Amino acid sequence: MTVEYAAPMKFFSFWRSLASFRVRIALNLKGLPSDVIFVDLDANAHRTDAYRNVNPQMALPALVWDDGTTLFQSLAIIEYLDETHPSPPLLPADARGRARVRALALMVACEGHPLLTPRVRRYLDHELNLRDTQQQAWRRHWTVETLAAIEAHLAGDKATARFCHGDTPTLADICLVGHVHAAVTQQIDLAPYPTVKRIFETAMALPAFAKAHPLAQPDTPEAMRGKAG
């Protein structure tokens, strides 16, 4: 398949961004180089005019080519990469398999993760004046609810194997590991979710996943390095 954009990609990323984590995994699995531009969310670099010109939503990640073409939203970026660089495939060959993988991915990317993002936490803090303990309870509730739902789907489906769907990583695994990382950072016990835990550990043993880990990035704070697990 002909690649639409052969020029080097600029990848706007941040070490702690789970959406950026997903795209890093996909780039690694595909063996695709990119010019990484770090956007410090903690310093509100995503809210500057410079980044607003890249992505008016002021969210990460974004892929930009020299001709000005910009892609945003992690799942759209990953599907583009999969269509233009089909090996290894991140979606199954059959329509039902693709629908299942997308559904699992969407459970995380469109239902679980949005409730944990910095802009939601900022609203809970600045607009609703929730205490730290209340905000922690919020994050924990939605993280656990998503884990439980995914576990039920994975454990009850014969299509689940070494990974979420079959024996090779798919878009579903790319999304799953980020959500589990969010659970680990909250010290949530994964014992009630054995299928999720097994797949997470299997995926993170692969170099493409391990090298994409939030705690293993060039912009990861030095104090956080080496804590990836």
For the regions a language model picked out, list residue spans one by one.
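Phosphate-coordinating loops and pocket residues in cytosolic domains that bind phosphorylated ligands
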Residues: 53, 205, 214
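GST-like fold's C-terminal all-alpha helical module
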Residues: 112-205
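Conserved beta-strand edge residues that scaffold enzyme active sites
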Residues: 41-42, 197, 217
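Acidic/histidine-enriched, glycine/proline-rich intrinsically disordered or flexible terminal extensions
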Residues: 216-229
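Generic structural signal for helix capping and beta-alpha/helix-loop junctions
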Residues: 44, 200, 220-221
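Active-site-flanking alpha-helical
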Residues: 82, 179-180, 213
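GST-like domain detector, emphasizing the conserved glutathione-binding G-site
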Residues: 1-134
